[in-house]
Amino acid sequence: MSERESWHKEIDLFLVAMGYFTRIPMPKWVEVDSDKLNKASRYFGLVGLLVGLLSAIVFWLTQNWLPAGVSVLLAMLVGVLLTGGFHEDGLADTFDGFGGGWTAEDKLRIMKDSRLGSYGALALMLALLLKWQLLVELALYDPVVAGSALIVAHTVSRVVSASIIFSEKYVRDDETSKSKPLSQHQGINELLILIASGVLVLLFLKGLAALSLLLVMIGLRRLIIVIFRRQIGGYTGDTLGAAQQIAEIVCYFVLLVVGNIL
């Protein structure tokens, strides 16, 4: 394969990842199949970088003219519109299942139900409120830090979420599941590129902030995996969405705490 063909292949995989995780239209020439989607997992972090960057741009463009809370809300709205609330939906379904089911089978069945339950509604509401409040505090501390936090958190949280695919068992047997192709044949190349995208955005941060966030994310990933194993024996697409949302919120927490210390 020539260098040009290799670059074309990687761009193709990135566009597949973008089409999977966002509402941004893919070019007509991009063909999607299970093998491509599987390999595209290497670029899930970069998709987060794109979403975070666009959200940060909206925040930076409006923060001089609008109250911090409104600018943050607009930035969050951009993120939701770009992704279609994909991860938020997974968070709600996961909390409905984990909160309402007694056995792993019950939890998986509840998570499959498209209706929103009380546990999911509470989790979704609290998650959005937490993100808004934390970002407002970061914006009041330093608008540059708040915008950078959006970029870092959207990227790193997706790296944490997607990395679960490489070590854990996919527990749904439904062949029509949108996440089923991701559970097959993940390679070391996908993992290394995924991790590299997370390390890349840490350059936005100072040394202590970057190190603190890295250590917390490693610990959080381990904690999430332990919970998923105990609850359902592995992961589903919904739980990956929940992991992303939780990791994003924790990112904001860490950056706010470290920012106040510095």
UniProtKB/Swiss-Prot annotation:
Catalysed reaction, written as an equation: alpha-ribazole + adenosylcob(III)inamide-GDP = adenosylcob(III)alamin + GMP + H(+); alpha-ribazole 5'-phosphate + adenosylcob(III)inamide-GDP = adenosylcob(III)alamin 5'-phosphate + GMP + H(+)
Keyword Transferase assigned: yes
GO MF annotations in UniProt: adenosylcobinamide-GDP ribazoletransferase activity; cobalamin 5'-phosphate synthase activity
Location in the cell: Cell inner membrane
EC class: transferase
Pathway: Cofactor biosynthesis; adenosylcobalamin biosynthesis; adenosylcobalamin from cob(II)yrinate a,c-diamide: step 7/7
Domain of life: Bacteria
Sequence intervals crossing the membrane: 43-63, 66-86, 120-140, 146-166, 191-211, 242-262
GO cellular component, one term: plasma membrane
Example GO biological process: cobalamin biosynthetic process
Broad class of where this protein is predominantly found: membrane
Alphabetical list of Pfam families matching this protein: CobS
Reported cofactor(s): Mg(2+)
Record has Membrane as a keyword: yes
Function recorded in the entry: Joins adenosylcobinamide-GDP and alpha-ribazole to generate adenosylcobalamin (Ado-cobalamin). Also synthesizes adenosylcobalamin 5'-phosphate from adenosylcobinamide-GDP and alpha-ribazole 5'-phosphate.
HAMAP family: CobS
Protein name in UniProt: Adenosylcobinamide-GDP ribazoletransferase
Biological classification of the source: Bacteria, Pseudomonadati, Pseudomonadota, Gammaproteobacteria, Alteromonadales
